[in-house]
């Protein structure tokens, strides 16, 4: 048993337990080029045959860092190696009042781009990669902000078409 197959098996169990995907579904993988989303893409690639998934890839290019172009090229090359269709969605992040801050405005632009991309490829689900560290960070951030019990749940397995 390899680490990759063990991870794919655990992910498959989670997908089934939480009803995240149905067999034959069309999925858009949101891939930034970071470790979380690359792992997501690798696992979706490993599971697509057994679940009959049609997987497409999108990279949202915020243009905020000098490495943004290299990240996009990396995601396109990785997708090509895996035999998956991919494209880049360039977004303009709002930087004028009323303004909620760079992180919030980037998230808003990214989510809108992901919804557009999903419609364009006919995806019923948008997969994003999150780790246990992301979960812990989300819960801690919400505690600091004075969350109620619902905020202690962290990142949900499913929210609308996002998984």
Each PLM stretch: what is its role?
Residues 1-163:
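Core alpha/beta nucleotide-donor-binding catalytic domains of modification enzymes
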């Amino acid at each position: 048993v390899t680490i990759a197959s063990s991870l794919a098996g655990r992910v498959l169990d989670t997908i089934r337990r939480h009803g995240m995907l149905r067999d034959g579904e069309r999925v858009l993988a949101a891939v930034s080029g970071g470790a979380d989303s690359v792992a997501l893409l690798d696992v979706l690639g490993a599971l697509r045959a057994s679940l009959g998934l049609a997987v497409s890839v999108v990279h949202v290019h915020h243009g905020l860092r000098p490495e943004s172009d290299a990240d996009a090229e990396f995601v396109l090359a990785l997708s090509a190696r895996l035999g998956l269709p991919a494209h880049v969605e360039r977004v303009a992040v709002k930087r004028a009042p009323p303004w909620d801050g760079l992180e919030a405005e980037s998230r808003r632009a990214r989510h809108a781009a992901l919804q557009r991309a999903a419609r364009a490829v006919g995806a019923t689900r948008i997969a994003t990669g999150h780790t246990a560290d992301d979960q812990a960070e989300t819960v801690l951030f919400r505690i600091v902000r004075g969350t109620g019990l619902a905020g202690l749940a962290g990142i949900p397995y499913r929210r609308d078409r996002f998984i």
